[in-house]
Amino acid sequence: MESIEDKALETYSKNIEYFSKNHKELMKLLTTLDIAINTGDYEPRYDLEYIDGYFDIKDIKTGAYVYNGNSLNISKDISRLVDFKKNKRTFEGFPIYTFSDEQVEKAGGITKLVAGVLPMTRYYFEHSDQKGTMKEINKFIFVGVRLGLHIPIIHEKIKSAEYLIIEDDLEIFKLSLFTTQYYTLAQDATLYFSVADDENLFLKTTRLYLRDTFYENRYLKYVLFPTYPTNKLKQIQNSIMTQSFI
């Protein structure tokens, strides 16, 4: 029987192969981190530990754990937060124009762009349930990866075609390569990664995610990892509001 350690190393190796071929810039960051650790220029802050049947991330200096409990059960709890409701954990990816004829007249007319979509958006607004449920979730955002154990569980639940995966800590993301099979997920969906990005790079990545298949951006569902900083939600909203066609 394959040991836990062997399975983790195999997962890591296949992930590295996947990133080397498909996400070269992220692979450069991971390689740079490895070199810095091996040369002693960077002292690792975190360690991956296997405790009573589950993995956790240990802060080497403080001894604190990121999950501080059964990470498998916690990941299942996170997956239960995800639903198909339009008004829960959702970004609205583009506006719905609902101007009345009177409002248009008072404004002195509308631009050609808005004029072209106004009849369609009016129809959509009048004939759709803005607080109902979605039949499918085609694009989804993971805000905070940690070990990524919740990612495949949520994918099994929603089967999205595109995922934006966000993690600010490169060292923690590297640990997730031992526990989460990104290479398997990539067989079912298109993956966008924002890892250790500054604000400019984050904006660039999110704009790419929003631009491709922009017609699927009406409702963008997301899940925020517990204890993960909420400032990324505001940055995502800023990216949405600065799309070129809004």
Regions inferred by a protein language model and the residue ranges of each:
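N-terminal donor/sugar-recognition subdomains of glycan-related enzymes
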Residues: 1-246
